[in-house]
Amino acid sequence: MSDSAPTNPTPTNPAPEESASAVATLEPGPVSQWLNTQGFDHDVLDPDHVGVEQIGVESAVLPIIVAAIKSHGFDYLQCQGGYDEGPGERLVCFYHFIAMAEQVEAMTAGRPHELREVRLKVFLSREGTPSLPSIYGLFRGADWQERETFDMYGIEFEGHPHPKRLLMPEDWKGWPLRKDYVQPDFYEMQDAF
């Protein structure tokens, strides 16, 4: 028996060119389909590990798309955060929305209802000062969440009413959750106090 890959493609082992084309043609989820009918430009991303629809948007149109999905029933910002794809790679800002009013209405009426949820992602260059518009004006719950993302990753939120650090001291240098962060020498910090 050979250790090499099978030479004949099967449904479970497609040919390499079939695999590449399958990845390139993701099926848009229901929110993405709705955004298409409304004329909003966005990217279809793979669903997450539990099947939540994920959509990529440009930072300039983030507030417009957030307002649109809010009017489409996604009335609750469950969480906002960021992550670093790795040294030299992009920073990512994500927003997870759920249709809370629909869920409450269904539960009150005793009807089974599957929770509608969607996650928006904005991909940012780590060069310079990454920034995007704040959605605080649409969702007040974004206040501390955007501040934490700024504090840990250095992503600025334009138009945020309280643009200051949340967890770290105001004079802290750097962004502690970035993969390229160089931690200050612990003993030098200890001597400062």
Curated annotation (Swiss-Prot):
Its main location: membrane. Gene3D superfamilies: NADH:ubiquinone oxidoreductase, 30kDa subunit. Pfam families: Complex1_30kDa. GO terms for biological process: photosynthesis, light reaction. Keywords: Membrane, NAD, NADP, Plastoquinone, Quinone, Thylakoid, Translocase, Transport. One of its GO terms (cellular component) is plasma membrane-derived thylakoid membrane. InterPro entries: NADH_DH_suC, NADH_quin_OxRdtase_su_C/D-like, NADH_UbQ_OxRdtase_30kDa_su, NADH_UbQ_OxRdtase_CS. The keyword Flavoprotein does not apply. It catalyses: a plastoquinone + NADH + (n+1) H(+)(in) = a plastoquinol + NAD(+) + n H(+)(out); a plastoquinone + NADPH + (n+1) H(+)(in) = a plastoquinol + NADP(+) + n H(+)(out). Its EC number is 7.1.1.-. It is found in: Cellular thylakoid membrane. It is a peripheral membrane protein. The keyword Transmembrane helix does not apply. Residues 1-21 are annotated as: Disordered. GO terms for molecular function: NADH dehydrogenase (ubiquinone) activity; quinone binding. NDH-1 shuttles electrons from an unknown electron donor, via FMN and iron-sulfur (Fe-S) centers, to quinones in the respiratory and/or the photosynthetic chain. The immediate electron acceptor for the enzyme in this species is believed to be plastoquinone. Couples the redox reaction to proton translocation, and thus conserves the redox energy in a proton gradient. Cyanobacterial NDH-1 also plays a role in inorganic carbon-concentration. NDH-1 can be composed of about 15 different subunits; different subcomplexes with different compositions have been identified which probably have different functions. Belongs to the complex I 30 kDa subunit family. This is NAD(P)H-quinone oxidoreductase subunit J. It comes from Synechococcus sp. (strain CC9902).
